[in-house]
Amino acid sequence: MSRFAQIFDEVLQEIIPTQQEIQAIDNIVEELKQHLKVRAIELGIKYTSMEPQGSTGIKQTQLRDDFDVDFFIGLDITQFEEKFKELSKSKLKQESKQYFLHLCNEWIIRSLKNTKFQEPSLFYAEHPYVRAIYVSDGNEVHVDIVMYLDLDLEYIKERGPITSVDRSPWHGLFIRDNLTVNQKNDVRLLKQFFKACHCYGDKSALGRMGFIGYSAELLIYYYKSLESLFLDFNNLPNNYLDFYKRSKNQLRKIMHMREDPLIIIDPIDKNRNVASAISLRAYKYCNHMISQFIQDPKVEYFQISPLKELNIDESHPLHAKAFIIELVNNNADVHYTINRDKLYSLAESIKSLGEKEVSHEKRFGSIVFELYFEDSTQEYNLAFYCEQPLISKTFLRKGPPIKDKRHVERFKEKNPDFVKKAKHLWVETTRDYTEFLKFLDDLVNEKLPDNFSLINIAQSSKSKTTSAKKALFVLIHMVLPFLDHPAQ
């Protein structure tokens, strides 16, 4: 028995779903099928399959208390192609959205009217789907009903999917058929570990996206066991996990994979890197925690605890360099991923404009940010580290090379107080901003998305909400220690 086995076994006792939970999901699925079949017959709708996908479906890699159901309905691609046979693949994709929208409204939502599936509503990812709530034994089960085009595996491998969810049933079959029961338990342990690190899914506290379920499943598939993965996790960026056995150079020649920090190729689609969206920050923090676990294995590394709050006072070494933006979302209908992406765009703009003047000279120096949000309270926070929050009123702006006579004369006319330095002309220029906090305030008020209200922009010591204090903890204790920048 390995030195980790006892820990793994102890954790598994707490996270493997109970038979009662599994049976409850099975009952919900059967009830859903019956409602959908009745309406399908009425409308003359033909489908190829109806079954649950994801971890609670055919994969069976879910954690205890994971009651969400991803229910997939396959549509016959031959009928679909006959209807839209003259369209290109991109046009076919667009038309499929309209067709799926029609089926969501006329088939799925109407099927669930006056049933135990409450509040069936339209949601949108790449194309429309329906979400409903089913209460079972006091637990709210979110049921997502998703349609896809039932494509042959060879079609996907040769031409790719028409919509991204067309791969999903094949993902389920691959995991079902290629992981043993013990390996599926290793997947559960890995998911639990990522969640304990707050680095799982699209609500990851670090980066825009953490590790996802399918990436965890494939990591166990490629490494064979959780122990093997943990012992080599530090080398993951250098290990190109490719079902198709291509070399590093071959993979890096694929344009959309050139900059991806991690490579985990989808066995179903050779052109898809499952790890493309996983934040390097999430990897680095998980790598640190795995290293700690290897040195001193404890059950506590798998226990999910709330993020800590960081109360910063003037004695803290980063007191003057850490800042917080506290926001509240006023429109609960806007999905958190949309809000996340909007605020990432705002923060990237702050970073870009804050690090350099318009003329590219250094401004406030290195800027690092992290977004932390709590969907349940609609609170969103951007925490910033700024290398030089107070800077001089003027700076030397670089002009043309001295040898460029035509541009030199024009520069001299506009800037009679020029100086010569390092083979260029320079001129002392007044800055628009000398205080990072003022710069932050103006830019946020100019660019903040309309659905947000501003609660607070301040130095870190003046944060107000508990979620803001958590954002500061994430930035200072989970992000900055693992980045190469002046704070270290």
Give the predicted meaning of each segment.
Residues 1-64, 73-99, 148-151, 170-171, ...:
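N-terminal regions immediately upstream of nucleotidyltransferase
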